[in-house]
Amino acid sequence: MTINLDKIKIPDDWKQLLASEFLSPYFADIKTHYLNALQNKEMIYPKPHQIFAAFNLTPLSSLKVVILGQDPYHGSGIIEGVETPQAMGLSFSVPRGMPIPPSLKNIYAELSQSLHITPPTHGDLSGWARQGVLLLNAILSVRANAPASHKHFGWEYFSDGVIRALSAHKEHLVFMLWGNYAKKKAPLIDASKHKIITAPHPSPLARGFVGSNVFLQANIYLQEHAKEPIAWEKL
């Protein structure tokens, strides 16, 4: 199977915002690495048509919040008898029918504690994406069962470019940076016109995410700037 990343559709407004990224030498390198991996018969997650799912589900015009993840889930599970990747192109999200990963369970625990939201029974965060939450991974692909295996592709140049472009061309966005890796992206963001909310990573290996009030803080900021808050319970 081969795939041309240029042929994967994303909305025109995102294409225009990120035109210089897609035309850059580093993105040509990403495409070469990706094509080589496919030609080498690597099992790659998420599926090719879902690589840019975050941009397809979240209209640029209604963008309010960016939640930065690091690496796509590298595992899979069985849904209705079919082996299915955990990764679906949205940070922290897994398809309906997939067991909820530990980090997402902690995200739900924080929602329960701070906003009294009953934890969903699934891990599909598409409902957030459609409300204007960009669920962006810093690295957009991974080889099955091999975490960070595509780090050398150069995806982080792309995700850094996305963050810079949003910081420069949008106003009053909330950037959620959870964990030390994400916090290092703060210098890419103009804090004079955006809200940066940091917290420990929601992984059970870290402590302090539950009780951080990150979702409450985000909605307070949005309302202060005449924006509709995110209905975090709508999933």
From Swiss-Prot:
The active site is at D71 (proton acceptor). It catalyses: Hydrolyzes single-stranded DNA or mismatched double-stranded DNA and polynucleotides, releasing free uracil. It comes from the Bacteria. It is found in: Cytoplasm. GO terms for biological process: base-excision repair, AP site formation via deaminated base removal. GO terms for cellular component: cytoplasm. Its main location: cytoplasm. The keyword Cell membrane does not apply. InterPro entries: UDG_fam1 (IPR002043), Ura-DNA_Glyclase_AS (IPR018085), Uracil-DNA_glycosylase-like (IPR005122), Uracil-DNA_glycosylase-like_sf (IPR036895). Keywords: Cytoplasm, DNA damage, DNA repair, Hydrolase. SMART domains: UDG, UreE_C. Belongs to the uracil-DNA glycosylase (UDG) superfamily. UNG family. Excises uracil residues from the DNA which can arise as a result of misincorporation of dUMP residues by DNA polymerase or due to deamination of cytosine. This is Uracil-DNA glycosylase. The gene is ung.
